[in-house]
Amino acid sequence: LALACLTIIGLSACTPEKEPTWTYDKNKMLFTGQDASVQVLSATKIESPEGQKAVRVHYKLSNSSKETMNAYTLLMKVVLDVKQEKEELKVATLVFSKDDDRDMIANKTKIAPKEVKEIVVDYAVADFDHDLSIDFSDYGTEANATAKLSLQNLEKAPVKYFDKKAQ
């Protein structure tokens, strides 16, 4: 009996209640987590000449940790998933052209402590009829928030943007 009590006391001593250290500003679409903040600045509908569709989301990231972070890793820590209806969207890698691989650029981008960088990520979509929802979470804690992006009002990027010959 004494051992059970000690175990219970030990467990309760080991798991102090943590206050969530995050905030979400719905108007600014800004999620501030414990080591980083992610803001959705804009989104653009894009389509390749072959008819592949994607949504290009422009993020503003800031690193409040003490370590330099890879931009993409930081983004993936805070952006839990991006969905259309209930379908999870995949990051569109090389959907358009090798010259325009935003995700590779995002992967190479390093964000030093206290630094702010903007990166752009493309998400492959089946159509532009269903809105996008971006779920934020602070590193697997219970904290979460959802940003809704209506694709109806988005600008569409000109197709020539993806033509390798067009400069």
Each language-model region and where it sits:
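Beta-strand elements of well-folded, non-transmembrane domains
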Residues: 44, 61-65, 80-84, 125-127, ...
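Low-complexity, acidic Ser/Thr/Pro/Gly-rich terminal tails and inter-domain linkers that flank the onset
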Residues: 18-51
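Surface-exposed edge beta-strand/loop patches
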Residues: 25, 30, 110-167
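Short, solvent-exposed loop/turn segments enriched in Ser/Thr/Gly
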Residues: 52-57
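Buried hydrophobic-core signal for structured, non-transmembrane domains
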Residues: 58-61, 121
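C-terminal motif of bacterial Sec signal peptides marking the signal peptidase cleavage site
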Residues: 9-13
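Sec-dependent N-terminal signal peptides
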Residues: 1-8
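The feature marks short-to-medium sequence segments in extracytoplasmic or secretory-pathway proteins
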Residues: 49-51, 62-115
